[in-house]
């Protein structure tokens, strides 16, 4: 039978919270899509959408950009539009069906489909054929999911977004299992492996048998011993950095002025600005929604009452000037530097803001201690539910940007031994595995 669909082969798409990538497997060889950037090309496409208003022929139009072009146009714009990050994190929310941008209503699926459309068009240009079928990664547990029903709801929203983007069929595969296929392609023997896939929004784990023998006899349900996941990863680590270093400089620990000067009356303990604003500041996918008239009025009032009005002014400037991306980059730089060295300096300077702080790795690991414990418990639960002892696992393969964090890797080195822990192609292994899985399914079609 034909090994491809009538409208071309299936491709593998890793639509991630922070980054996305696409790959096509042909005769066992995997080719990743390269995306143009101002400085050359990249195989990692930022999962961001930038919308702005432009005048054309006397009419105002809403122009959209995605990926590297979104960042470039956002940075060049004198008057910032809306930069929307981490859209994948909205998928479980039943209360957030969409948002209004420049007076036009967009559903979450509409926004995601804009990114997916550009991913598809880039793939079509490189492979010189129509792309209508995809094997798509999904986390074991979506951000915000509290039940299997929440995950199913998120999958259906994501499926609709793919259909809106011009795809005709979509097959979903667990992201850690996809990473396992990529790892399997390097083996000349069978192994029982634990895969840890750490993205921006989720940490996912799978325990399964892989190898040439497994492929030769044909995969069965018994080869997969278990999956486990939780809705925290790199973005959760970022939130801790924002809470510790950024929010206090923007007034999170500031209070209203006390008008009671008498000694027998306590000073004001009422926060100058509501806590939910700072909670949204910590989450990249909510940051763009702070730029509203309601928030502006709240902060104007807070500025008038604050003991430290200059901090509230800095917060207002951050929101009004749309500096979320610059803040995100500063946080990312600190996290990356602390993954490679013991100390680093956090720097975020823009206008009325001048935040500089020295941070050491031990201090950072203290900030993310709760998240690290959650990851460790998730792995322990997977082993227990699968009736597998740590010593029986042949290899641990870690992928995703957060796998670079030494404290994350240490969890697995302690449990399984450093010699059994491997990493590789941290940003593209899921897409590679999805492409191999797509080729495998096409061959059986």
Label every PLM stretch briefly.
Residues 2-41, 68-195, 209-236, 355-389, ...:
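N-terminal phosphate-binding loop and flanking beta/alpha elements of the actin-like ATPase fold
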Residues 12, 61, 157, 345-348:
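Short acidic/polar alpha-helix capping motifs at helix-coil junctions
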Residues 16-18, 43-46, 341-342:
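A short, compositionally biased
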Residues 18, 201-203:
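Conserved Rossmann-like nucleotide-cofactor binding loop
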Residues 28-159, 163, 240, 246-323, ...:
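Phosphate-binding loop and its immediate beta->loop->alpha context
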Residues 198:
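Rossmann-like NAD(P)H-binding beta-loop-alpha module
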Residues 215, 239-255, 279-445:
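Helical "lid/coupling" subdomains associated with nucleotide-phosphate turnover
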């Amino acid at each position: 039978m034909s090994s491809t669909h009538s409208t071309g082969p299936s491709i593998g798409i890793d639509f991630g919270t922070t980054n996305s990538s696409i790959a096509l497997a042909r005769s066992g060889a995997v080719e990743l899509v390269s995306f143009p950037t101002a400085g050359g090309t990249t195989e990692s496409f930022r999962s961001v959408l930038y919308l702005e208003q432009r005048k054309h022929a006397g009419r105002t139009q809403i122009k959209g950009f995605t990926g590297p072009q979104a960042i470039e146009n956002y940075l060049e714009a004198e008057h910032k539009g809306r930069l929307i990050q981490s859209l994948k994190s909205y998928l479980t929310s039943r209360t957030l069906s969409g948002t209004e941008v420049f007076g036009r209503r967009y559903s979450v699926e509409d926004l995601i489909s804009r990114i997916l459309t550009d991913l598809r068009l880039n793939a079509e240009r490189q492979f010189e054929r129509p792309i209508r079928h995809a094997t798509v990664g999904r986390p074991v547990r979506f951000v915000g999911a509290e039940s299997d029903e929440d995950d199913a709801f998120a999958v259906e929203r994501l499926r609709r977004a793919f259909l809106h983007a011009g795809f005709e069929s979509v097959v979903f595969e667990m992201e850690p299992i996809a990473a396992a296929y990529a790892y399997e392609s390097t083996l000349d023997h069978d192994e029982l492996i634990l895969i840890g896939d750490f993205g921006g929004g989720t940490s996912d784990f799978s325990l399964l048998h892989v190898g040439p023998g497994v492929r030769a006899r044909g995969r069965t349900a018994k080869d997969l011993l278990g999956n486990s996941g939780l809705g925290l990863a790199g973005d959760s680590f970022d939130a801790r950095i924002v809470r510790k270093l950024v929010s206090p400089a923007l007034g999170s620990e500031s209070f209203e002025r006390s008008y009671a000067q008498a000694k027998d009356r306590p000073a004001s303990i009422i926060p100058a600005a509501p806590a939910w604003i700072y909670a949204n500041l910590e989450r990249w996918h909510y940051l763009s929604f702070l730029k509203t008239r309601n928030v502006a009025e709240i902060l104007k009032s807070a500025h008038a009452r604050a003991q430290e009005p200059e901090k509230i002014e800095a917060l207002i400037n951050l929101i009004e000037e749309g500096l979320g991306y610059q803040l995100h980059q500063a946080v990312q730089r600190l996290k990356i530097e602390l993954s490679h060295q013991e100390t680093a300096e956090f720097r975020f300077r823009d206008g009325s803001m001048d935040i500089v702080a020295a941070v050491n790795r031990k201090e950072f690991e203290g900030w993310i201690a709760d998240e690290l414990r959650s990851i460790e418990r998730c792995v322990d639960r997977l082993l227990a539910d699968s009736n597998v002892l740590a010593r029986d696992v042949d290899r641990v393969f870690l992928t995703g940007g957060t796998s670079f964090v030494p404290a994350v890797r240490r969890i697995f080195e302690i449990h399984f031994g450093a010699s059994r822990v491997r990493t590789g192609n941290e940003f593209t292994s899921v897409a590679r595995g999805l492409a191999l899985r797509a080729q495998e399914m096409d061959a059986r079609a």
